[in-house]
Amino acid sequence: MARTTSQLYDAVPIQSSVVLCSCPSPSMVRTQTESSTPPGIPGGSRQGPAMDGTAAEPRPGAGSLQHAQPPPQPRKKRPEDFKFGKILGEGSFSTVVLARELATSREYAIKILEKRHIIKENKVPYVTRERDVMSRLDHPFFVKLYFTFQDDEKLYFGLSYAKNGELLKYIRKIGSFDETCTRFYTAEIVSALEYLHGKGIIHRDLKPENILLNEDMHIQITDFGTAKVLSPESKQARANSFVGTAQYVSPELLTEKSACKSSDLWALGCIIYQLVAGLPPFRAGNEYLIFQKIIKLEYDFPEKFFPKARDLVEKLLVLDATKRLGCEEMEGYGPLKAHPFFESVTWENLHQQTPPKLTAYLPAMSEDDEDCYGNYDNLLSQFGCMQVSSSSSSHSLSASDTGLPQRSGSNIEQYIHDLDSNSFELDLQFSEDEKRLLLEKQAGGNPWHQFVENNLILKMGPVDKRKGLFARRRQLLLTEGPHLYYVDPVNKVLKGEIPWSQELRPEAKNFKTFFVHTPNRTYYLMDPSGNAHKWCRKIQEVWRQRYQSHPDAAVQ
């Protein structure tokens, strides 16, 4: 153990502690070097400050010189100085945890790295690179490194806490940003890249997962483990192995194994496309096929893509890295910031502006449909119970405990309302015996029974399931449980399930379009028959029976 620790201390000397300065701007930090000598190594000599940050003892006979000694340096932070809370994220060799400093009550995102794992997986260069790059950055659109410390087993990086998490979470939640939101967040990313490239740094893994949002919903770019600091005479960096993420990797990295500042501009083009369309431009079943599409520039714009945003993306997704808008060969960031897409942007104080409310945009898919806008602002913090009428709620899906009159006889056909061969819904006032008969009938003749785990289907029908600007036909199956399954009707494959919880809430937008809100995502669905309100009504009915008639189910 001693040798392992010594190796890491030699390879990853944590010598600098970044501390807050008394500047009015929260983005300002000051780097304080503790010592020019390596930190103490167990079993070795200790000529510099101790690792706990206390000053070294004065040498005997040096009393006459004590007045010339520098003041003692601040005590190095230790794990016991913090109360550690929830896990914010996990990487291949690190965990990020929310922590509150006991002395100041300040919150930090502390990145904890296991020394043994770093050495075993040869990740020492990633750790040192991330620390070195972050110590160079002083800009409001980047996560800040405030301090570093270590114990015998772990390294700790104290980072600014981006309270609202990843940009990707919001893309998945609302599907497609409206033009105002797309413009604002693209402008912040451009401003950040201009600063980063001005420092001679290439990020090399820019993607929505690595763009966080702080408490005020401004961006904070993070994850510099694969970043590269260019030497003054170099314009590009060689990559001996693949770095980055498949959907956002630039063609020059695939063909020449080199990355340049313009590689980040390619990733910017992919991100803009994803903000508008809801999905990245290059998509396929595996990484090899994605790479083939990238090097052939094979991608399409969906209908209703904002025209000015499309023009900008086309000027960024260019195979020749020297022809991308914003690169040095194209006169830098001036022409990029002057693009018509940004004509209403005030660049000077973006970090002080109030971000627009996140608003989903669902353009009409045909001339007969309407555009839909979904204001996501209230959904950020409010997912209370649906306030719906509890009239005639039953304790189960059977009629035995309800106040509703039971229908006479055992003719189960009276409960089934067929709309067409692939659409029907059930009345819910059936007995347990009738439910058994309905389930037998379903198992024997309904081709969708195989997808619902032997649950009774209460309503089903084809819908167009929207994800951003893309739509796919699905068979939607509302069942007991409750469950909301959706199936590919052509390939007969179960594609997924809308997660049920007490916070689930249906919302009809017009005759065809309805939303199903869940805490982590809003599902956008369109009923081609124009009966969106019937889906919402049936979902509400099942929701009431699940949560208002079974209060204990809400905490399960």
Curated annotation (Swiss-Prot):
Please name the GO terms that the record assigns under molecular function. 3-phosphoinositide-dependent protein kinase activity; ATP binding; phospholipase activator activity; phospholipase binding; protein serine kinase activity; protein serine/threonine kinase activity
The answer to whether keyword Transferase applies is yes
What region holds the Protein kinase domain? Answer: 82-342
Quickly give the catalysed reaction: L-seryl-[protein] + ATP = O-phospho-L-seryl-[protein] + ADP + H(+); L-threonyl-[protein] + ATP = O-phospho-L-threonyl-[protein] + ADP + H(+)
Positions of region (PIF-pocket): 113-157
Against PROSITE patterns, the record matches this protein to:
PROTEIN_KINASE_ATP, PROTEIN_KINASE_DOM, PROTEIN_KINASE_ST
**Which sites bind ATP?**
S92, F93, S94, K111, S160, Y161, A162, E166, E209, D223
Identify the Pfam families for this entry.
Answer: PH_3 (PF14593), Pkinase (PF00069)
Gene Ontology process terms (BP): actin cytoskeleton organization; calcium-mediated signaling; cell migration; cellular response to epidermal growth factor stimulus; cellular response to insulin stimulus; epidermal growth factor receptor signaling pathway; extrinsic apoptotic signaling pathway; hyperosmotic response
Q: In which tissues is it expressed?
A: Appears to be expressed ubiquitously. The Tyr-9 phosphorylated form is markedly increased in diseased tissue compared with normal tissue from lung, liver, colon and breast.
What does the record say about activity regulation?
Homodimerization regulates its activity by maintaining the kinase in an autoinhibitory conformation. NPRL2 down-regulates its activity by interfering with tyrosine phosphorylation at the Tyr-9, Tyr-373 and Tyr-376 residues. The 14-3-3 protein YWHAQ acts as a negative regulator by association with the residues surrounding the Ser-241 residue. STRAP positively regulates its activity by enhancing its autophosphorylation and by stimulating its dissociation from YWHAQ. SMAD2, SMAD3, SMAD4 and SMAD7 also positively regulate its activity by stimulating its dissociation from YWHAQ.
Q: How is it modified after translation?
A: Phosphorylation on Ser-241 in the activation loop is required for full activity. PDPK1 itself can autophosphorylate Ser-241, leading to its own activation. Autophosphorylation is inhibited by the apoptotic C-terminus cleavage product of PKN2. Tyr-9 phosphorylation is critical for stabilization of both PDPK1 and the PDPK1/SRC complex via HSP90-mediated protection of PDPK1 degradation. Angiotensin II stimulates the tyrosine phosphorylation of PDPK1 in vascular smooth muscle in a calcium- and SRC-dependent manner. Phosphorylated on Tyr-9, Tyr-373 and Tyr-376 by INSR in response to insulin. Autophosphorylated; autophosphorylation is inhibited by the apoptotic C-terminus cleavage product of PKN2.
- What factors induce this protein? Stimulated by insulin, and the oxidants hydrogen peroxide and peroxovanadate.
Q: Give the GO cellular component terms, alphabetically.
A: cell projection; cytoplasm; cytoplasmic vesicle; cytosol; focal adhesion; nucleus; plasma membrane; postsynaptic density
Annotated segments matching region Disordered: 26-80
Q: Which residues carry this modification: Phosphotyrosine?
A: Y9, Y373, Y376
What coarse category fits the chief subcellular location reported for this protein?
Answer: cytoplasm
Q: Which family does it belong to?
A: Belongs to the protein kinase superfamily. AGC Ser/Thr protein kinase family. PDPK1 subfamily.
Q: What is known of its domains?
A: The PH domain plays a pivotal role in the localization and nuclear import of PDPK1 and is also essential for its homodimerization.
* Summary of subunit composition and partner proteins: Homodimer in its autoinhibited state. Active as monomer. Interacts with NPRL2, PPARG, PAK1, PTK2B, GRB14, PKN1 (via C-terminus), STRAP and IKKB. The Tyr-9 phosphorylated form interacts with SRC, RASA1 and CRK (via their SH2 domains). Interacts with SGK3 in a phosphorylation-dependent manner. The tyrosine-phosphorylated form interacts with PTPN6. The Ser-241 phosphorylated form interacts with YWHAH and YWHAQ. Binds INSR in response to insulin. Interacts (via PH domain) with SMAD3, SMAD4 and SMAD7.
Q: What is this protein called?
A: 3-phosphoinositide-dependent protein kinase 1
What is the native source organism of this protein? Homo sapiens
